[in-house]
């Protein structure tokens, strides 16, 4: 909010819980209604700040709103940073089926700021590591080697954002791992 105020940008925002159980078409409809209520224009980019579920449902809402409204994704979790956030696949669950509704609508920009990782529960850090292991096993064994080199320090330091100095070994390994995982995803 401070950034937008400093740059005299009119900011309207909504807060949504975005757990896996919330990844439903009704949440997409809610977001669509809010965009209409706020008077968001078709070509006015929407800023989405959140994790993987929000990337999926808010990205899908952007795809539907006036047929492909642009959006910027600011990723706050590891999974959204390396998978859901930059992905052109947007979706929601419906009628008891996972990812029943969807559209291809990539963000115009996807940003991952590791400083958000310090707010994550260790379970969410491990979830991100599991996603990276999957990528490494399928495509790039260097990811597995980097994960082994970092060891439990990845969880303890939330990918180099807690109790560590910039430029430290874990800071460097964290950046390498995230960069290589994102590269692996994009390729």
Which residues are covered by each model-predicted region?
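ATP/NTP phosphate-donor binding region
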Residues: 1-45, 134
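Short, structurally constrained coil/turn elements
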Residues: 5-7, 40, 65, 94, ...
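Loop/helix-junction capping segments adjacent to catalytic residues or to phosphate/diphosphate-binding pockets
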Residues: 21-25, 55-56, 119
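Generic structural signal for well-ordered, non-membrane alpha-helical segments
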Residues: 24, 28, 122-129, 140, ...
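Amphipathic, well-packed alpha-helical segments that form the structural scaffold of globular domains
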Residues: 32, 148, 182-186
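Active-site and donor-binding regions of nucleotide-sugar-utilizing enzymes
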Residues: 40-72
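A glycine/threonine-rich phosphate-anchoring loop and its flanking beta-alpha core
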Residues: 59-156
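Active-site segments that bind and position negatively charged phosphate/pyrophosphate groups
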Residues: 156-187
């Amino acid at each position: 909010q401070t950034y937008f105020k400093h740059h005299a940008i009119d900011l309207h925002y909504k807060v949504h819980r975005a757990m896996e159980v919330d990844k439903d078409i009704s949440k997409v409809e809610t977001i669509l209604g809010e965009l209409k209520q706020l008077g968001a224009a078709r070509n006015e980019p929407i800023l989405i700040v959140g994790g993987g579920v929000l990337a999926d449902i808010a990205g899908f809402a952007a795809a539907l709103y006036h047929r492909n409204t642009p959006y910027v994704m600011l990723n706050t979790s590891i999974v959204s940073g390396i998978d859901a956030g930059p992905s052109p696949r947007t979706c929601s669950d419906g009628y008891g089926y996972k990812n029943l509704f969807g559209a291809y609508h990539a963000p115009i920009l996807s940003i991952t700021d590791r400083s958000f990782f310090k707010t994550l529960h260790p379970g969410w850090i491990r979830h991100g590591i599991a996603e990276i292991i999957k990528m490494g096993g399928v495509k790039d064994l260097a990811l597995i080697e980097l994960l082994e080199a970092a060891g439990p320090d990845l969880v303890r330091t939330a990918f180099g954002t807690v109790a560590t100095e910039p430029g430290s070994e874990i800071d460097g390994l964290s950046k390498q791992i995230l960069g290589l995982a994102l590269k692996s995803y994009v390729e």
